[in-house]
């Protein structure tokens, strides 16, 4: 399941192997502040686009909801039902019951902090899929999965309840994301989708009685590294997890494309070709995942670790960064070539690039050749109109970035 916070990310997910996408509209979702989100008017088009691609659509309505938002809440659910959205991801019982009253399938958000079989049984009154708490280890996940099978716990649609877990992306230092730090310091509630991420800053610990500053190994003491499970994804699957969820609705389309493609390849190696997760494949996928936004990686709590691992810097530890240089003008499908205008910087054969657009998604490729008019050249510079081979269609206005090593 891929995170979608923009049109670019949506099409990046669709072209990279995602089986489902999740996203928010208007407010009432946990990334209302940090991602672009969509409007109610977008729902029908998103649902139709994904349906045509054979991809399911999951709408997040997973914040705390107040009485004053009942009308908006109802409008969102009505629009979701009318558009044919596959399911609602929710945590507030008001959203859960209202969605079921409209005939919408419900998935229980990780905000509900489900850690045991009885909680799964309780939510199975409304939900066909539950996201377990991120603080569980794989033995605990396996015990819950076994209990669902053994006790035949079924959701409203008649099938056994499915377990969904996060497999990659940002983690919060609070239990299942229930954090009040942003509200306390900035009057902006994380539980309302408005986290200001002040936990990601560097902090100095001071003894208030003496004024002494304490020497700590890492100043980013509230900023966890990102979760990565690709090197033990076979164990996650064996634990009974049926839906893998990637975090990252606030991240760019190149992140979505890269992470979805990596986990798709890993799953196919585990399930389809019998080769499994070889050390060579894991190393290759690790290299790819390191290129896009991350705060460093750790295993989360899945392998039994009790304490978190913290970031060592502010912002991303990615090995690549995007630098905008050009805008697409047209595409020549028979030639497999895109034409661009260089607006900043320069480009040379062998450079790695990312091309993004609301319909294009994210294309990651290496420049094989550059032409000015019909003549091959060794570089394109500011003001040049140039053409390069592209792996798929590009559209006027698409943005071309140099994806350069950090």
Tell me the role of every PLM-derived stretch.
Residues 1-16, 20-32, 46-47, 53-61, ...:
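Surface-exposed amphipathic alpha-helical tracts and adjacent flexible/coil segments at the periphery
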Residues 1-4, 87-91:
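Short, hydrophobic beta-strand segments that form beta-sheet elements in well-ordered domains
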Residues 35-44, 49:
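A phosphate-binding glycine/aspartate-rich beta-alpha loop in the early core of alpha/beta enzymes
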């Amino acid at each position: 399941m891929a995170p979608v916070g923009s049109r670019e990310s949506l099409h990046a997910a669709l072209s990279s192997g995602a089986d489902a996408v999740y996203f928010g509209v208007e407010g009432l979702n946990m990334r209302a502040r940090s991602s672009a989100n969509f409007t109610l008017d977008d729902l029908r088009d998103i649902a139709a686009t994904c349906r045509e691609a054979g991809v399911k659509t999951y709408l997040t309505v997973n914040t705390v909801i107040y009485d004053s938002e009942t009308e908006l809440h109802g409008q969102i659910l009505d629009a979701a039902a009318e558009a044919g959205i596959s399911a609602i991801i929710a945590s507030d019982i008001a959203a859960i019951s209202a969605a079921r009253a409209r005939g919408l399938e419900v998935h229980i958000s990780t905000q509900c902090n489900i850690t045991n079989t009885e909680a799964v049984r309780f939510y199975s009154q409304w939900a066909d899929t539950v996201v377990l708490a991120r603080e569980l280890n794989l033995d605990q996940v396996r015990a819950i999965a076994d209990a669902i099978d053994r006790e035949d716990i079924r959701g409203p649609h008649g099938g056994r309840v499915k377990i969904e877990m996060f497999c990659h992306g940002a983690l919060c230092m609070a239990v299942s994301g229930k954090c009040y730090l942003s509200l306390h310091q900035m009057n902006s509630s994380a539980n309302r989708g408005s986290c200001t991420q002040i936990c990601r800053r560097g902090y100095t610990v001071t003894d208030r009685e003496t004024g002494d500053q304490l020497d700590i190994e890492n100043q980013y003491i509230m900023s966890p590294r990102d979760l990565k499970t690709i090197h033990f994804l076979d164990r996650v699957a064996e634990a009974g997890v049926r839906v893998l969820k990637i975090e990252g609705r606030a991240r760019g389309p190149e992140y979505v494309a890269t992470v979805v493609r990596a986990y798709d390849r890993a799953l196919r190696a585990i399930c389809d070709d019998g080769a499994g997760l070889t050390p060579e494949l894991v190393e290759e996928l690790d290299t790819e995942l390191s290129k896009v936004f991350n705060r460093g990686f750790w295993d989360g709590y899945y392998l039994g670790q009790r304490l978190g691992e913290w970031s060592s810097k502010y912002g991303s530890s990615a090995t690549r960064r995007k630098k905008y240089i050009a805008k697409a003008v047209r595409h020549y499908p028979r030639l497999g070539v895109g034409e661009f205008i260089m607006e900043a910087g320069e480009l040379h054969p062998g450079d790695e690039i990312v091309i993004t657009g609301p319909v294009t998604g994210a294309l990651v490729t290496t420049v094989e050749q550059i032409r000015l008019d019909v003549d091959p050249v060794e570089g394109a510079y500011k003001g040049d109109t140039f053409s390069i081979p592209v792996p798929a269609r590009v559209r006027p206005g698409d943005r071309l970035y140099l994806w350069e090593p950090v």
